[in-house]
């Protein structure tokens, strides 16, 4: 994975721990789900985010893109990854507050649409060049 993709992936993981902890504390532990079945729950919740952001599950994306290596997030724009990170945090909040998966999907999709409109309207789409500039500035300080 090149530096640009690495930076984009790290950005997408910012709220990952908050998200997975909410799943564990509010779904896995209370329902006494086995370790084997827990991975299915985590994957299902990841797909809630994928559908809210990209309109398809990871499996659907792989089926539509058999020639591409990696996953849907590896090919996302930086602005989409920023939005996805925000959605992870929002989903954790909704899980903590007992909101069901279908209702969360609706709210997450609304939030994704709203955020992406802001990025487009305000011309705030981030580019890899911005990321590289920020990284270079941090190194030079």
Pin down the residues of each PLM region.
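Positively charged, phosphate-engaging catalytic surfaces used for nucleic-acid and nucleotide handling
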Residues: 1-141
